[in-house]
């Protein structure tokens, strides 16, 4: 059984301000050159050719998830007797679903890695962005379904055998949120490679490199 309230038709848009500069992103990448399984002379011979800031859009659905579940767990005593414990569990927590709203396949970014908090209103044209694609209605549906699955997964962790569950989803926010990343291109020998830096915290999100 599912009980839901509708989300407002208008989609809010927000963005995370960039928290690091181009220079900080450059230094983060150069540190990354020295770590992991990479060519031993990468830090010495790599040449950064481009380093630019780009905002990528994510769908984000925040909802209060509620559920009541009944079920049981069983265990066998040393004597061989099978014991059954009956449980009733309640869930009342906030759940967050995110999904990249553009094609970032070559960068390997699929979900938002930042928690809600610190965003500012998005002003179109104020920053360089990748355009959001796809249907907002379909994204909203995927978000609802995903959060219901999260609720049931949490319930299943508490009750070994669920015999009855009812989930309730109360949407709070459905929005597009734009997140800054520094895209750093570099060369090594005749090869061309890319590193993605979190534009808020300065962490490396992913990258390609020549192997040892």
Locate the predicted segments by residue.
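Charged, low-complexity helical/coil segments in non-catalytic cytosolic or luminal regions
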Residues: 2-192, 209-211
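Hydrophobic "anchor" residues
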Residues: 192, 203-204
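Short, acidic, Ser/Thr-enriched surface-loop or helix-capping motifs
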Residues: 198-199
């Amino acid at each position: 059984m599912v009980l839901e309230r509708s989300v407002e038709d208008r989609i809010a848009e927000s963005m995370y301000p960039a928290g690091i500069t181009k220079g900080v992103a450059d230094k983060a990448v150069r540190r990354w050159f020295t770590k992991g399984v990479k060519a031993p002379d990468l830090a010495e011979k790599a040449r950064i050719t481009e380093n630019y800031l780009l905002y990528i859009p994510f769908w984000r659905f925040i909802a209060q998830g509620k559920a009541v579940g009944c079920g049981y767990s069983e265990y066998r005593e040393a004597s061989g007797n099978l014991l059954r414990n009956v449980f009733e569990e309640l869930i009342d927590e906030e759940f967050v679903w995110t999904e990249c709203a553009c094609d970032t396949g070559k960068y390997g970014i699929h979900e938002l890695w930042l928690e809600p908090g610190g965003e500012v209103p998005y002003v179109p044209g104020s920053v360089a962005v990748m355009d959001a694609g796809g249907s907002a209605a379909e994204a909203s549906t995927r978000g609802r379904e995903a959060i219901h699955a999260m609720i049931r997964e949490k319930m299943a962790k508490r009750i070994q055998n669920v015999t009855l569950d009812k989930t309730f989803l109360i949407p709070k926010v459905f929005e597009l949120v734009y997140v800054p990343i520094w895209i750093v291109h570099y060369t090594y020998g005749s090869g061309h490679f890319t590193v993605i830096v979190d534009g808020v915290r300065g962490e490396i999100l992913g990258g390609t490199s020549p192997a040892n």
